[in-house]
């Protein structure tokens, strides 16, 4: 067995926000048919990978609230890659956690993708991006997005990706109550109970929605056109049932230089966009005490052109 014991890799694993989330219908496999725009932001976790020759995946973290066992997506990703590649050695992995858990920012999915990318390099497997995306899709619907990163159209259950040729430079303020989490599965179930009569099954109609997002999605996010809007269908469910989300959206809507605001994913994190990161920083400085007094953690972020990166 080749001795790679001293080889280490460090990776930045960024969060995402949804700039568009449209629930179109229900697929035969039980997943929902979606049309989304996802964007990486610079709120990120950091992972360190080191080869071990014991054939074991050992995960440690500075986050006490995180399971480090086989149900963790990092461990699942590593074991899947080992099985796929039929290798004998393992890895020691350390996760420095900054992205809040259960927040609608897909920190776990980002970590899973970072693990596939990192171990592909560490173990010198030379798997191409298409293969990594295929593996990622078996682990979770939005993990393939993180293999590619940046800003992307995401269709199907989230695994069908189309790169958007654009660089958005907005700043963002994120708010999340640290004591509140939202179950993604429960949110989709509640949405389906309320709106299943509006679901589409006709493939041509579904493709028309995809085409409309391709043609107009960026225009809706272009401040120069003074037409900045964000759609999140799941917000219709979560906002009505979660006072923390409702209050966060209200607080963000009242910020002086806010361009638009929304919930990310299935929540409960909410965000407001500003013309640049500096403007967002000033707004957070002016309102940080208010946010804290209302029970929210807050972050200032900007958009990333790329997703997971080696550091």
From Swiss-Prot:
Q: What is the lineage of its organism?
A: Bacteria, Bacillati, Cyanobacteriota, Cyanophyceae, Synechococcales
User: What is this protein's function?
Assistant: Catalyzes the phosphorylation of the position 2 hydroxy group of 4-diphosphocytidyl-2C-methyl-D-erythritol.
The EC category is transferase
The UniProt record lists the EC number as: 2.7.1.148
Q: Name one GO molecular function term.
A: ATP binding
Keywords for the protein's UniProt record, in alphabetical order:
ATP-binding, Isoprene biosynthesis, Kinase, Nucleotide-binding, Transferase
The reply to whether rRNA-binding figures as a keyword in the UniProt entry is: no
**Reactions it catalyzes:** 4-CDP-2-C-methyl-D-erythritol + ATP = 4-CDP-2-C-methyl-D-erythritol 2-phosphate + ADP + H(+)
Gene3D superfamilies attached to this UniProt entry: 3.30.230.10, GHMP kinase, C-terminal domain
According to UniProt, the name of this protein is: 4-diphosphocytidyl-2-C-methyl-D-erythritol kinase
Question: Per the UniProt entry, what is one GO biological process?
Answer: terpenoid biosynthetic process
List the InterPro entries hit by this protein, alphabetically.
Answer: GHMP_kinase_C_dom, GHMP_kinase_C_sf, GHMP_kinase_N_dom, IspE, Ribosomal_Su5_D2-typ_SF, Ribsml_uS5_D2-typ_fold_subgr
Q: Where is the active site?
A: 16, 142
Q: Which family does it belong to?
A: Belongs to the GHMP kinase family. IspE subfamily.
Decide whether keyword ATP-binding is in the record.
yes
